[in-house]
């Protein structure tokens, strides 16, 4: 299994990105790719300029499913792809997660933000336009898109294709005011994370304990996830 690791940064986060990438190399990833704005195909950029030109998330994080999809295209079936936010780095070996994903039937690891509910952090239009506006989705804990782990196979290629398609819809990914009334508990939209999270539930992808320091207090909720902290998620430019 060839292990790919990717991240993305604009000017502010380039130093943090380098630290993240260096830590991935240190812990044994075979190919470490540090993407930047210049790696986005001009045709894709201009097609989605209304989204990608926005400052929040350097384009509401649309680049994330784009680069995951782009990387999958160059990989062989059975290879591992890990996306990591540049505002984090590896402190310990990710081998426990590699062992876990190689046993996973779907080839996906998804990490749960226990207690952070979808209807609080996802605007109503996203539920409606993804045809997932029902309690089993709206009243569940969100999955994070800080780290996305995939084994390339037919299922994950199609999953990422769907992720990317929804992310190109301004009504779903951006902060445009929802035409459908938000749930009363709604606080703030989580953009590509809301999309990724809902797709994980749509396809019954198993939730796992967070791999950063934020997972330390969640061990009781995930007794089968015996791994300790693997990353430090700091969210800082340096």
Model-derived features with residue positions:
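Glycosyltransferase catalytic domains, chiefly GT-A lineage
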Residues: 1-238
């Amino acid at each position: 299994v060839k292990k790919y690791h990717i991240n993305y940064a604009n000017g502010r986060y380039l130093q943090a990105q380098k630290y993240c990438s260096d830590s991935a190399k240190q812990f044994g990833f075979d190919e470490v790719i540090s993407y930047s704005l210049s790696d986005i195909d001009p045709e894709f950029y201009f097609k989605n300029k209304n989204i990608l030109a926005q400052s929040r998330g350097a384009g509401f994080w649309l680049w994330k499913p784009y680069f995951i999809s782009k990387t999958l295209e160059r990989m062989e079936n059975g290879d591992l792809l890990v996306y990591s936010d540049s505002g984090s780095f590896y402190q310990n070996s990710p081998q426990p997660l590699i062992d876990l994903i190689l046993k996973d039937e779907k080839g996906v690891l998804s990490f749960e933000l226990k207690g952070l509910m979808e209807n609080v952090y996802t605007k109503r239009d996203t539920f409606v336009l993804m045809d997932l506006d029902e309690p089993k989705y709206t009243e569940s804990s969100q999955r994070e898109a800080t780290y996305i782990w995939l084994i390339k196979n037919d299922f994950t290629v199609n999953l990422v294709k769907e992720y990317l398609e929804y992310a190109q819809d301004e009504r779903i990914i951006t902060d445009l005011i929802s035409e459908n009334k938000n749930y009363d508990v709604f606080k703030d939209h989580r953009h590509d994370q809301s999309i990724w999270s809902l797709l994980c539930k749509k396809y019954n992808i198993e939730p796992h304990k967070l791999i950063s320091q934020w997972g330390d207090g969640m061990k009781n909720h995930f007794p089968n996830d015996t791994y300790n902290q693997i990353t430090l998620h700091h969210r800082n430019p340096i």
